[in-house]
Amino acid sequence: MTRKEIEEIVTEIANPVVNKHSFELVDVEFIKEGSSWYLRIYIDKPGGITIDDCQVVSEEISDILDKEDPIPHSYFLEVSSPGLDRPLKKESDFERFKGELVEVKVFKPIEGKKIFEGELVGYKDNKIIIKKNGNELMEFERDKVALVRRVIKF
């Protein structure tokens, strides 16, 4: 079974648990670091996720994973907040963070650059739209974008 298939199965398992608590399932990652595998589930809610929220979701998902056993080897389960600089992946993410400063990384350089920063204007017709330097609009086709994340200035 591939990583992507495992992530899809776990997403199907996690969604009802997360929704039951009125949280948002932000992402599921199944990755190998060193010799260990990690199943990371990122959740969020308006106002932010607490450690208690993570614990409740972790325990419920862990029970289901133990029963259904979809992953053929050992792994560590981690449930956490996606963090302030979370990647924006879903259309709802682009709507939620409209007006905020974002960083867009593309796979192939555009005019010699791979990283662009600007105000998130929106997402339309499978394109991410940002405003650079106050008023210059840039559009990025979703399949040409490696990563979009919020830029947090302190």
Swiss-Prot record:
It is found in: Cytoplasm. Transmembrane segments: none annotated. Keywords: Cytoplasm, Ribosome biogenesis. GO terms for biological process: ribosomal small subunit assembly; translation. Pfam families: DUF150_C (PF17384), RimP_N (PF02576). GO terms for cellular component: cytosol. It comes from the Bacteria. Required for maturation of 30S ribosomal subunits. Belongs to the RimP family. This is Ribosome maturation factor RimP. It comes from Acetivibrio thermocellus (strain ATCC 27405 / DSM 1237 / JCM 9322 / NBRC 103400 / NCIMB 10682 / NRRL B-4536 / VPI 7372) (Clostridium thermocellum). The gene is rimP.
